[in-house]
Amino acid sequence: MAITQERKTQLISEFKTHESDTGSPEVQIAVLTESINNLNEHLRTHKKDHHSRRGLLKMVGRRRNLLTYLRNKDVTRYRELINKLGLRR
């Protein structure tokens, strides 16, 4: 259900903007998207897990805020990230 450290490192290396980058909006959004996708798979099989559903909604809200921040700050980076992750915004 949670992302492994190897997968997280892989996402960071894929979306980083500079060499020691771990906290840029792109990296945070990519890690959140991976967690959201994993939690969606979990909730498909465990429909009554409302505690995890609440966590999913919090993650989606956090990702939405980061996407709004990135769109306001740099539209080209925002569009590239949306296309790369395959999000529908």
UniProtKB/Swiss-Prot annotation:
Family annotation (SMART domains): Ribosomal_S15
Chaperone keyword on record: no
GO molecular function, one term: structural constituent of ribosome
Keyword Transmembrane: no
GO biological process: translation
A single cellular component GO annotation: cytosolic small ribosomal subunit
CDD domains, sorted: Ribosomal_S15p_S13e
Cited InterPro entries: Ribosomal_uS15, Ribosomal_uS15_bac-type, uS15_NS1_RNA-bd_sf
Swiss-Prot/TrEMBL keywords: Ribonucleoprotein, Ribosomal protein, RNA-binding, rRNA-binding
Pfam families to which the protein is assigned, alphabetical: Ribosomal_S15 (PF00312)
Assembly information from the UniProt record: Part of the 30S ribosomal subunit. Forms a bridge to the 50S subunit in the 70S ribosome, contacting the 23S rRNA.
Function: One of the primary rRNA binding proteins, it binds directly to 16S rRNA where it helps nucleate assembly of the platform of the 30S subunit by binding and bridging several RNA helices of the 16S rRNA. Forms an intersubunit bridge (bridge B4) with the 23S rRNA of the 50S subunit in the ribosome.
Family label: Belongs to the universal ribosomal protein uS15 family.
PANTHER family: RIBOSOMAL PROTEIN S15, BACTERIAL AND ORGANELLAR, SMALL RIBOSOMAL SUBUNIT PROTEIN US15M
Name of the protein this chain belongs to: Small ribosomal subunit protein uS15
Name of the encoding gene: rpsO
